């Protein structure tokens, strides 16, 4: 089931959880979507600023599988 997250800090907390499996990054011309797959929900964060998206990509946990989709 999908859930949308508005706060970057909340998204990072979800990504650091034990049941977080992978992160999908979808880049569009106007925004970047980060989708983290946990056991029950798929959490989505939409960012319109490209620089913030790059910083968030750098701060993802290292053990998490990251998949980029164009």
Swiss-Prot record:
- Keyword Ribonucleoprotein among UniProt keywords: yes
Which Pfam family is one of those matched by this entry?
Answer: Ribosomal_L38e
Annotated membrane-spanning segments are none
* Molecular functions (GO terms): structural constituent of ribosome
GO cellular component, as recorded: cytosolic large ribosomal subunit
The alphabetized UniProt keywords are: Ribonucleoprotein, Ribosomal protein
Renumbered to this chain, the signal peptide range is none
BP terms from Gene Ontology: protein-RNA complex assembly; translation
What family does the entry list? Belongs to the eukaryotic ribosomal protein eL38 family.
Name of the protein:
Large ribosomal subunit protein eL38
Q: What is the lineage of its organism?
A: Eukaryota, Metazoa, Ecdysozoa, Arthropoda, Hexapoda
Q: Which gene encodes it?
A: RpL38
């Amino acid at each position: 089931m999908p859930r949308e997250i508005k706060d970057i800090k909340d998204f990072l907390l979800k990504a650091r959880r034990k049941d977080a499996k992978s992160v999908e990054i979808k880049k569009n011309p106007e925004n970047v979507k980060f989708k983290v797959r946990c056991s029950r929900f798929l959490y989505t964060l939409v960012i319109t600023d490209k620089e913030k998206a790059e910083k968030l990509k750098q701060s993802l946990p290292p053990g998490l599988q990251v998949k980029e989709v164009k």
